[in-house]
A protein has these predicted regions:
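Extracytoplasmic soluble-region selector
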Residues: 1-36
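Beta-strand-connecting loop/turn residues
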Residues: 3, 54, 143-145
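Extracytoplasmic/periplasmic beta-strand context in beta-sandwich domains
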Residues: 3, 27, 47, 77-79, ...
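Short loop/turn segments at connectors of secondary-structure elements within structured domains
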Residues: 23-25, 40, 158-162
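A broad, low-specificity signal marking well-ordered, structured residues that form hydrophobic/aromatic
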Residues: 27, 44, 164
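Short domain-boundary/entry signatures in modular proteins, especially
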Residues: 31-41, 127-136
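Local sequence-structure signature of Cys/Sec-based thiol-disulfide redox active-site neighborhoods
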Residues: 35-75
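Short, conserved sequence motifs used for protein processing/export or organelle targeting and
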Residues: 66, 72-182
């Protein structure tokens, strides 16, 4: 019940989500207890609040490409606002983080990526160095129009208040982009 699920034991759990009047299909979640590695490789995420109408937003995209040239441990996601790629999740994130201007990018949800982003690549890269005591792995299988995910977490310490956010992204969308920088 409620908007979260906490497994208190190992086993299989049948769950579904509902938001009146919609109800999802039921899925099965397997919870198992395995030994975690002694350390996990740190990763980072850049959440880019953007839109095709935003003429200054290519600056952040360029910054992301510079980060990707330096490391494969930083991932990015575009949360589109005000264009055909906008969805309710992008709006929920925008509202939760109080985004009012574009572009805005967050690194690991803990800090706004400093302007000008292409000159502050180290801010993102440095968040993805070293080891962590919490880890995550995701495997996926695409079968026609159905995607199956295997999500595993590992904890080498007790951590409270953790949340797991999973994005399923579509890549390679071609659209016209306003650009005031070139």
């Amino acid at each position: 019940n409620g908007s979260s699920f906490l497994a208190e034991s190992v086993g299989s759990f049948n769950i579904k989500a509902s938001l009146t009047p919609q109800i999802s299909n039921e899925i099965i979640i397997q919870v198992s207890n395995v030994d975690a590695p002694s350390a996990f490789t740190k990763k980072a995420i850049i959440e880019d609040y953007t839109g095709t109408w935003c003429g200054w937003c290519p600056r952040v995209s360029y910054g992301i490409s510079l980060v990707e040239e330096q490391t494969d441990k930083v991932f990015s996601v575009g949360a589109h606002i005000g264009d055909f790629m906008e969805n309710s999740y992008s709006n929920s994130l925008k509202d939760a983080f109080g985004v009012t201007g574009y572009p805005t990018a967050y690194v690991n949800r803990s800090a706004v990526w400093a302007y000008p982003e292409p000159n502050n690549v180290a801010q993102a890269v440095n968040q993805a160095t070293g080891v962590a005591n919490v880890g995550l792995s995701v495997g996926s299988i695409l079968d026609g129009s159905t995607i199956k995910l295997l999500v595993s977490t590992g904890f080498n310490e007790n951590v409270s208040g953790t949340k797991l956010v999973i994005f399923i992204l579509e890549d390679g969308i071609i659209a016209s982009q306003s650009n005031y920088t070139s």
